[in-house]
Amino acid sequence: VPEGAPLGPVLPAPEARKPFARARAEGKFLFAGGEKLYVRGVTYGTFRPDPDGHEYPSPAIVERDFALMAAHGFNAVRTYTAPPRWLLDLAEAHGLRLLIGLGGERSIGYVCEGRWNAEHERAFLDAASECYGHPAVLAFAIANEIPASIVRWLGAKRVERHVERLCTLVRRRDPGALVTYVSYPTTEYLRLPFLDFHCFNVYLEQREKLEAYLARLQNLTGDRPLVLAEIGLDSVRNGEERQAETLAWQVRTTFASGAAGAFVYAWTDEWHRGGEDVYDWAFGLTRRDRSPKPALDAVERAMREVPFAPDGDWPRISVVVCSYNGSRTLRDCLDGLMRIEYPNFEVIVVDDGSKDSVSAIASEYDVRLIRTENRGLSSARNTGMEAATGEIVAYTDDDARPDPHWLYYLADAFRRGTDSGVGGPNIVPPDDGWIAQCVAASPGGPAHVLLSDQSAEHIPGCNMAFRKRALQSIDGFDVRYRTAGDDVDLCWRLAERGLPLGFRAGAMVWHHRRGEVRTYWKQQVGYGRAEALLEAKWPERYNALGHVAWAGSIYGSGLSRAWTLKRPRIYQGSWGLAPFQRLYEPHEGTLASSILMPEWYLGVALLAVFALAGVFWAPLRFAIALFALAAAAPLALAITNAARVRFPYPARDLRERLLRRPLTAFLHAMQPLARLHGRLKHGLTPWRDRSGAGIVAPVARGRSIWCEEGRPAAERIDIDAN
């Protein structure tokens, strides 16, 4: 754009702003200064280089562009190269944060040739030397879309290690900065758990396909935030009106999926690439002279409604919190509920005969308090359901704190679909102690089971919502489950009625884990008891050893993985050109999986008896070696699983850094023992009688049946059976 060319309306100088707080990734979203930060972004560049090699317009043009962006509701800008310091200062002055591309994909050739060295690392870091520590930096994107052909040539593991190495370099240079990598559907199989948040470029022009793929990406990213680094549509081939319409629903769909942010590609049609100005693409919200297209107003309206428009017909929701002696965490739960942003809801607290200060704490808040005698969790939940005035009943635990937009995401799922119930993720809070962080990284925590990216087989009780009429149709919760198992039983009964369950990643709650090893043991013993109760009611869902055969996949942190010699498979299509390339995990073998089962320890105990006998009787001395191997196997697997853990938050001190991984390994080894104790104590044994007929001797028996008239043989057998 020539100097002095029209660049849109003249805007007043920006008002003085308070200094930026650095962004943090917590759970499924980004936060800054204690407030949630939805990234409402637009991409910028690349432009024809100036004499200094910077691929940006002059400061006057950049300032006008940034002023227009801020005026239209944007709060973030994505650049593809490291900007000069003056551009960062201008961004901060206009309230814009920058996602800065460091161009790591441009040097991938050195990795292919095996020539990547310390000199290349210094050059990579020095390119952004003016950016480190600047308050306007949202995050550094260390690379953008390493080509699928290169990833296939090098191998996914090698690329993952290279990306992790680049992330480590940036973190050492700027310890407080967020770091990410921008991927795309063709390399979605890259496993990058070390990123602070995940970015994808996604261009899908049908709403249903975008909704489905966003749900998939949310499951791939797990407990980390998801940001779409590029969405957009070319107005040359599709027209400006269709571009505006498409971008509006792309933005709304992205944020409705629970994404933490989105960048619209691009701010302007002006684009320089490969040494030439590009004229046959026009993805910009403004034209080359910065005159606005219809898409600019459409995107502005959509961005200002993030995550949802408050107006509209939002269903009434009754939030039910049941508590028995939960005063330690109840206040945090109710504080979170008081910060809920939703136009039509109520909070009901059911005090299930507590002996502590639950009722006193609840009385301090604007909630409906119901006191009952101690009848157990299921009964308390039924009491809350009966008192609810909403058409949707949402349950959370007294040790959980919902996200401010929790109810919006749940309600949107009910409005869009026919699910009878909807759940969401439960994530350990960043302020939980280090032992609680280790517990969260260990097995046995509340986890959701998904049949597909949006359909659930099970949703945990700390974060679940149901249509009230669906709960009433099955008479609510089964009161035999006093502390655990009620949510599993309810989900199975709904499934029996053909009532589906859904899952939404944005409907997040912070869920405190047990803060002591002793309480973790007690919790797992209780879960073992609940398994015994469930097996007694649902024997057809359990195998001979007393374990559930889930039809879906279990999601959540702390899952134990068995050893396997099989490698994951990547579907890459003919010539490696499939646009969506997926990773398929190998099936774990029976022997490897059995090491994870509580009953493995029964085998270890039996071998211990034989090994002890072998000390005194030579023919049984082989049992000593078998016992040593059997006892060492779960310990070695626990150490392996603990080594794989990626703690979401850094250690606070040296003691924590040294102890949390050994403690996690100990909890992985201990958890099956606790479950075994609870299962055996309440009759869930491998030798239990599953038929209900007792022990019957295997001898032939005869019986006489008198029939007044002839009957077919099959009918005579039925008469005998009855």
Describe the function of each predicted region.
Residues 336, 351-359, 400:
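A conserved acidic beta->alpha catalytic loop
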Residues 335-344:
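Short, acidic, metal-binding catalytic loop of nucleotide-sugar glycosyltransferases
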Residues 4, 265-313:
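Aromatic-rich peripheral "rim/lid" segments of glycoside hydrolase catalytic domains that contact
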Residues 151-152, 157-257, 284-286:
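Extracellular glycoside hydrolase catalytic/binding regions
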Residues 393:
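Short aromatic/hydrophobic "clamp" motif used to bind/position activated sugar donors
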Residues 424-425, 439-457, 472:
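Short, flexible, basic/aromatic active-site loop/helix in glycosyltransferases
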Residues 405-436, 500, 512:
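Conserved donor NDP-sugar-binding/catalytic core segment of glycosyltransferases
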Residues 29-195, 274:
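Active-site mouth of glycoside hydrolases
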